[in-house]
Amino acid sequence: MRISSVVEHRTPRVYVCYCLRSLSRPNQTYIGSTPDPIRRLRQHNGLVKQGAFYTRMARPWTMDVVVYGFPSKLAALQFEWSWQKPHASRHLRVMHDDGTRPNKSSATAAVYAGRSSKPLFPATRSSAPSSAASHDSGLNLRKKNRRVRMRSSTVPEYKFLVLRALLASEPFCFWHLHVGFYSEYAYGVWQFMDRANPTRYSVSRITRRPLPPSYPPVACDFRGVQGTNTPLAPPQDATAHTLRTSYPVLPEATTLSAAQKKKRSTSASCAPENEHMWAEEIPHARDAETLGLTWEQLEHAPTIARMEVPDGLMQASSAARGRSRRLRSHTSFLEALDQDASALEAHLVHASRKDMSSSICGLCGGHINRHVPLSYTHCPHACDAVFHLTCLARYSLEQETRAHARTFCLPTSAWCPMCQRPPVPWPEIVRRVFRRAELKVSM
């Protein structure tokens, strides 16, 4: 029997929002979410029954990018809806240049992006019911009352703009979400936009709150979500100079982007795809030279970042790994997601054994109730320190206040006052607290 995450919160091991790109219609995409990306892609391509009815006319599909690390399934669905409908999302609204109300400084005022503001990405097209029955009686009356649906562009590069805007906007920028790329083309588009705005993710878009230096974490696996693609490889006799100055031949370079089609089109009614208020532009072509994607950049593309676990802890989690659900994955990218969850359980098993000896908060000195696992947390770097969750949050907020004049309710990172190691994103601390609570219930 499944338990609702609303009644009893649980952090999903793997739940991703994905962007599909049609290979038969290069300018058509589909946004969705799933706990099993491999099976979901097979459903979209008609290889597995059930679901994926909307995408049946544009097969085959390929999965270009995934966003993962959501605190709950409901959070992923919120992100998916905003990615699908940026023109209607309240999180993607036009704000003042400094992110504040008029006549107020950024240190004292925060702005909520309500529906009264203009959308960052206005609707670019509209759809209405078919007029095939134009000769039916009473059609004129029905045409007056029919509803016109506003839609957002489905161009792949446009969806990348929306993704970057969501990752910079509240509350998504504080969830420490990860981005994974499964194609060289998708990684090249991301790099193209990243070079144009290298400080895009230094602060949040609305409250101007500093974000972690490595946000958002990016990883690549060019073998595809199913592990069946062959990554592009440079010539065997390529020199270091050749790798820096030459460009790979992308399969997507043979397709026309929306900008190229606009130049060739003579119709004045064709709506441009770059009519948006987001301060980034779409590349005008899909070849590697336009994207600035060299062989050297492909060789140094980031892979999945593994979680650091102290030596000897993996053996302690063998039983926990046996109880965990394994994804039917053939790629290191998805395997790493589940392996990180197993490593996290190993860390929590090791830390839970110290509960008897460490029952004093390292900050306030008060007693820690071990029977309420959601009230305390261990050091994120596996030292012996234990803290009340509220005490660690208060201490971390004090560290942030030194660099930022404003005070917030929750920190973006957690500092351990004992070991003085680099900070860890606060969502990771919360995720470990809930995972430890689940582990104690199952033990």
Curated annotation (Swiss-Prot):
The keyword Transmembrane does not apply. GO terms for cellular component: Slx1-Slx4 complex. Signal peptide: none annotated. Its cofactor is a divalent metal cation. It is found in: Nucleus. GO terms for biological process: double-strand break repair via homologous recombination. It comes from the Eukaryota. Keywords: DNA damage, DNA recombination, DNA repair, Endonuclease, Hydrolase, Metal-binding, Nuclease, Nucleus, Zinc, Zinc-finger. Its EC number is 3.1.-.-. GO terms for molecular function: 5'-flap endonuclease activity; crossover junction DNA endonuclease activity; zinc ion binding. Forms a heterodimer with SLX4. This is Structure-specific endonuclease subunit SLX1.
